Swiss-Prot record:
<dbReference type="Pfam" id="PF02357">
    <property type="entry name" value="NusG"/>
</dbReference>
<dbReference type="InterPro" id="IPR036735">
    <property type="entry name" value="NGN_dom_sf"/>
</dbReference>
<dbReference type="InterPro" id="IPR015869">
    <property type="entry name" value="Transcrpt_antiterm_NusG_bac_CS"/>
</dbReference>
<comment type="similarity">
    <text>Belongs to the NusG family.</text>
</comment>
<dbReference type="GO" id="GO:0005829">
    <property type="term" value="C:cytosol"/>
</dbReference>
<dbReference type="GO" id="GO:0031564">
    <property type="term" value="P:transcription antitermination"/>
</dbReference>
<keyword id="KW-0806">Transcription termination</keyword>
<dbReference type="InterPro" id="IPR008991">
    <property type="entry name" value="Translation_prot_SH3-like_sf"/>
</dbReference>
<dbReference type="GO" id="GO:0032784">
    <property type="term" value="P:regulation of DNA-templated transcription elongation"/>
</dbReference>
<dbReference type="InterPro" id="IPR047050">
    <property type="entry name" value="NGN"/>
</dbReference>
<dbReference type="GO" id="GO:0006353">
    <property type="term" value="P:DNA-templated transcription termination"/>
</dbReference>
<keyword id="KW-0804">Transcription</keyword>
<dbReference type="InterPro" id="IPR006645">
    <property type="entry name" value="NGN-like_dom"/>
</dbReference>
<comment type="subunit">
    <text>Does not interact with Rho.</text>
</comment>
<dbReference type="GO" id="GO:0009274">
    <property type="term" value="C:peptidoglycan-based cell wall"/>
</dbReference>
<dbReference type="GO" id="GO:0140673">
    <property type="term" value="P:transcription elongation-coupled chromatin remodeling"/>
</dbReference>
<keyword id="KW-0889">Transcription antitermination</keyword>
Amino acid sequence: MTTFDGDTSAGEAVDLTEANAFQDAAAPAEEVDPAAALKAELRSKPGDWYVVHSYAGYENKVKANLETRVQNLDVGDYIFQVEVPTEEVTEIKNGQRKQVNRKVLPGYILVRMDLTDDSWAAVRNTPGVTGFVGATSRPSALALDDVVKFLLPRGSTRKAAKGAASTAAAAEAGGLERPVVEVDYEVGESVTVMDGPFATLPATISEVNAEQQKLKVLVSIFGRETPVELTFGQVSKI
Protein backbone atom coordinates (compact mmCIF):
# COMPACT_ATOMS: atom_id res chain seq x y z
CA MET A 1 0.00 0.00 0.00
CA THR A 2 1.26 3.42 -0.89
CA THR A 3 2.01 5.72 2.03
CA PHE A 4 2.18 9.51 2.15
CA ASP A 5 4.26 11.77 4.37
CA GLY A 6 2.86 14.78 6.16
CA ASP A 7 -0.81 15.49 6.83
CA THR A 8 -2.15 13.60 3.81
CA SER A 9 -3.67 10.30 4.84
CA ALA A 10 -3.78 7.12 2.78
CA GLY A 11 -6.74 6.97 0.43
CA GLU A 12 -7.11 10.76 0.32
CA ALA A 13 -6.79 12.26 -3.16
CA VAL A 14 -3.66 14.29 -3.73
CA ASP A 15 -4.09 17.45 -5.84
CA LEU A 16 -0.96 17.75 -8.00
CA THR A 17 -2.30 20.62 -10.09
CA GLU A 18 -0.65 23.29 -7.98
CA ALA A 19 2.63 21.41 -7.81
CA ASN A 20 2.65 20.85 -11.57
CA ALA A 21 1.84 24.50 -12.18
CA PHE A 22 4.74 25.49 -9.95
CA GLN A 23 7.08 23.18 -11.84
CA ASP A 24 5.92 24.57 -15.18
CA ALA A 25 6.48 28.12 -13.96
CA ALA A 26 9.90 27.23 -12.60
CA ALA A 27 10.98 25.53 -15.83
CA PRO A 28 13.23 27.83 -17.85
CA ALA A 29 11.70 29.19 -21.04
CA GLU A 30 13.10 27.60 -24.16
CA GLU A 31 15.38 29.99 -25.99
CA VAL A 32 14.15 31.01 -29.41
CA ASP A 33 16.69 31.26 -32.20
CA PRO A 34 16.18 34.83 -33.50
CA ALA A 35 17.48 33.90 -36.95
CA ALA A 36 15.07 30.98 -37.27
CA ALA A 37 12.18 33.10 -35.99
CA LEU A 38 12.90 35.89 -38.47
CA LYS A 39 13.29 33.41 -41.33
CA ALA A 40 9.92 31.85 -40.52
CA GLU A 41 8.31 35.30 -40.38
CA LEU A 42 9.81 36.31 -43.73
CA ARG A 43 8.80 33.04 -45.36
CA SER A 44 5.17 33.63 -44.41
CA LYS A 45 5.05 36.99 -46.21
CA PRO A 46 4.37 37.49 -49.94
CA GLY A 47 7.00 38.46 -52.47
CA ASP A 48 10.73 37.93 -52.89
CA TRP A 49 13.58 40.15 -51.74
CA TYR A 50 15.66 42.05 -54.29
CA VAL A 51 18.78 44.15 -53.87
CA VAL A 52 18.74 47.60 -55.42
CA HIS A 53 21.74 49.84 -56.09
CA SER A 54 21.47 53.39 -54.78
CA TYR A 55 23.80 56.34 -54.37
CA ALA A 56 25.96 55.77 -51.29
CA GLY A 57 24.86 58.03 -48.46
CA TYR A 58 21.36 58.47 -49.90
CA GLU A 59 19.90 55.09 -48.97
CA ASN A 60 17.26 56.51 -46.58
CA LYS A 61 16.27 59.18 -49.10
CA VAL A 62 15.87 56.56 -51.82
CA LYS A 63 13.77 54.43 -49.45
CA ALA A 64 11.47 57.40 -48.79
CA ASN A 65 11.27 58.18 -52.53
CA LEU A 66 10.32 54.60 -53.37
CA GLU A 67 7.70 54.36 -50.63
CA THR A 68 6.12 57.57 -51.95
CA ARG A 69 6.10 56.22 -55.50
CA VAL A 70 4.47 52.98 -54.34
CA GLN A 71 1.54 55.02 -53.06
CA ASN A 72 1.38 57.46 -55.97
CA LEU A 73 1.63 54.75 -58.63
CA ASP A 74 -0.75 52.41 -56.78
CA VAL A 75 1.63 49.45 -56.86
CA GLY A 76 1.21 48.49 -53.21
CA ASP A 77 -0.14 45.13 -54.35
CA TYR A 78 3.29 44.30 -55.79
CA ILE A 79 5.81 46.22 -53.67
CA PHE A 80 5.40 45.35 -49.99
CA GLN A 81 8.45 46.47 -48.02
CA VAL A 82 11.57 48.60 -48.40
CA GLU A 83 14.47 48.31 -45.95
CA VAL A 84 17.85 49.94 -45.36
CA PRO A 85 19.62 47.33 -43.19
CA THR A 86 21.41 48.89 -40.21
CA GLU A 87 23.23 47.67 -37.12
CA GLU A 88 23.91 49.36 -33.79
CA VAL A 89 27.60 49.79 -33.04
CA THR A 90 29.70 51.61 -30.47
CA GLU A 91 31.92 54.41 -31.72
CA ILE A 92 34.55 56.36 -29.81
CA LYS A 93 34.86 60.03 -30.77
CA ASN A 94 36.78 62.61 -28.76
CA GLY A 95 37.23 60.05 -26.00
CA GLN A 96 33.48 59.43 -25.62
CA ARG A 97 31.57 56.29 -26.47
CA LYS A 98 28.22 56.50 -28.20
CA GLN A 99 25.84 54.09 -29.87
CA VAL A 100 25.20 54.79 -33.54
CA ASN A 101 23.26 53.07 -36.30
CA ARG A 102 25.48 52.09 -39.20
CA LYS A 103 24.36 50.81 -42.59
CA VAL A 104 25.11 47.15 -43.18
CA LEU A 105 25.07 47.52 -46.99
CA PRO A 106 26.28 51.00 -47.96
CA GLY A 107 24.92 51.86 -51.40
CA TYR A 108 22.12 49.27 -51.38
CA ILE A 109 18.52 48.90 -50.24
CA LEU A 110 16.38 45.75 -49.98
CA VAL A 111 12.91 45.56 -51.51
CA ARG A 112 10.31 42.84 -50.92
CA MET A 113 8.12 42.65 -54.00
CA ASP A 114 6.45 40.55 -56.66
CA LEU A 115 8.46 41.17 -59.81
CA THR A 116 6.18 42.52 -62.55
CA ASP A 117 6.71 45.06 -65.31
CA ASP A 118 4.98 47.72 -63.21
CA SER A 119 6.86 46.98 -59.99
CA TRP A 120 10.20 46.78 -61.83
CA ALA A 121 9.58 50.17 -63.48
CA ALA A 122 8.44 51.75 -60.21
CA VAL A 123 11.67 50.75 -58.49
CA ARG A 124 14.04 51.28 -61.41
CA ASN A 125 12.80 54.82 -62.10
CA THR A 126 12.93 55.96 -58.48
CA PRO A 127 15.26 58.97 -58.04
CA GLY A 128 18.57 57.77 -56.61
CA VAL A 129 18.21 54.18 -57.83
CA THR A 130 20.94 53.09 -60.24
CA GLY A 131 19.67 49.57 -60.92
CA PHE A 132 18.90 46.11 -59.62
CA VAL A 133 21.50 43.54 -58.67
CA GLY A 134 21.37 40.75 -61.25
CA ALA A 135 20.37 40.66 -64.89
CA THR A 136 19.14 43.99 -66.26
CA SER A 137 15.80 42.65 -67.47
CA ARG A 138 15.31 39.95 -64.84
CA PRO A 139 16.86 40.73 -61.43
CA SER A 140 17.82 37.82 -59.18
CA ALA A 141 15.95 37.36 -55.90
CA LEU A 142 18.05 37.29 -52.74
CA ALA A 143 18.23 33.99 -50.84
CA LEU A 144 16.19 34.07 -47.63
CA ASP A 145 19.23 33.15 -45.52
CA ASP A 146 21.02 36.24 -46.84
CA VAL A 147 18.00 38.43 -46.10
CA VAL A 148 18.05 37.19 -42.50
CA LYS A 149 21.76 37.98 -42.16
CA PHE A 150 21.23 41.53 -43.38
CA LEU A 151 18.05 42.29 -41.41
CA LEU A 152 18.77 40.52 -38.11
CA PRO A 153 19.76 43.03 -35.43
CA ARG A 154 23.45 42.91 -34.60
CA GLY A 155 22.84 42.22 -30.90
CA SER A 156 20.93 39.05 -31.67
CA THR A 157 23.96 37.34 -33.14
CA ARG A 158 26.87 38.94 -31.36
CA LYS A 159 26.07 38.95 -27.66
CA ALA A 160 29.63 37.97 -26.85
CA ALA A 161 31.01 40.96 -28.72
CA LYS A 162 28.56 43.24 -26.93
CA GLY A 163 29.63 41.81 -23.59
CA ALA A 164 33.26 42.43 -24.43
CA ALA A 165 32.49 46.03 -25.35
CA SER A 166 30.62 46.52 -22.07
CA THR A 167 33.58 45.15 -20.13
CA ALA A 168 35.94 47.54 -21.91
CA ALA A 169 33.61 50.46 -21.21
CA ALA A 170 33.41 49.53 -17.52
CA ALA A 171 37.18 49.33 -17.27
CA GLU A 172 37.53 52.73 -18.89
CA ALA A 173 34.87 54.27 -16.62
CA GLY A 174 36.63 52.84 -13.57
CA GLY A 175 39.88 54.48 -14.52
CA LEU A 176 41.65 51.21 -15.23
CA GLU A 177 44.54 51.31 -17.61
CA ARG A 178 43.63 49.72 -20.90
CA PRO A 179 46.13 47.18 -22.18
CA VAL A 180 48.32 48.17 -25.09
CA VAL A 181 47.01 46.55 -28.24
CA GLU A 182 49.58 45.08 -30.57
CA VAL A 183 48.27 45.64 -34.08
CA ASP A 184 49.02 42.73 -36.35
CA TYR A 185 47.20 44.09 -39.40
CA GLU A 186 48.28 46.47 -42.12
CA VAL A 187 46.66 48.34 -44.98
CA GLY A 188 46.46 46.27 -48.15
CA GLU A 189 46.50 42.95 -46.31
CA SER A 190 43.99 40.27 -47.34
CA VAL A 191 41.83 38.74 -44.61
CA THR A 192 38.74 36.54 -44.27
CA VAL A 193 35.62 37.85 -42.55
CA MET A 194 34.71 35.46 -39.72
CA ASP A 195 31.54 37.00 -38.26
CA GLY A 196 28.41 38.87 -39.28
CA PRO A 197 26.56 39.12 -42.59
CA PHE A 198 29.77 38.79 -44.63
CA ALA A 199 31.23 35.76 -42.84
CA THR A 200 33.53 33.60 -45.03
CA LEU A 201 34.04 36.38 -47.61
CA PRO A 202 37.56 37.59 -48.45
CA ALA A 203 38.35 41.25 -47.81
CA THR A 204 41.17 43.75 -48.19
CA ILE A 205 42.12 46.07 -45.33
CA SER A 206 41.89 49.77 -46.26
CA GLU A 207 42.19 51.35 -42.78
CA VAL A 208 43.46 50.25 -39.36
CA ASN A 209 42.24 51.92 -36.14
CA ALA A 210 44.39 50.61 -33.28
CA GLU A 211 42.70 52.68 -30.57
CA GLN A 212 39.21 51.37 -31.33
CA GLN A 213 40.52 47.94 -32.41
CA LYS A 214 38.67 48.24 -35.69
CA LEU A 215 39.41 47.75 -39.36
CA LYS A 216 37.83 49.17 -42.46
CA VAL A 217 37.90 46.53 -45.17
CA LEU A 218 36.73 46.31 -48.76
CA VAL A 219 34.35 43.42 -49.43
CA SER A 220 33.03 42.48 -52.86
CA ILE A 221 29.25 42.68 -52.46
CA PHE A 222 27.12 41.91 -55.51
CA GLY A 223 30.11 42.56 -57.76
CA ARG A 224 31.05 45.91 -56.23
CA GLU A 225 33.73 46.68 -53.63
CA THR A 226 32.01 48.06 -50.53
CA PRO A 227 33.72 49.46 -47.40
CA VAL A 228 32.74 47.62 -44.21
CA GLU A 229 33.88 48.36 -40.66
CA LEU A 230 34.80 45.35 -38.51
CA THR A 231 36.54 44.66 -35.22
CA PHE A 232 39.87 42.86 -35.04
CA GLY A 233 38.04 39.78 -33.76
CA GLN A 234 35.77 39.62 -36.79
CA VAL A 235 38.51 38.84 -39.29
CA SER A 236 41.21 36.23 -39.70
CA LYS A 237 44.47 36.33 -41.59
CA ILE A 238 44.59 34.31 -44.77
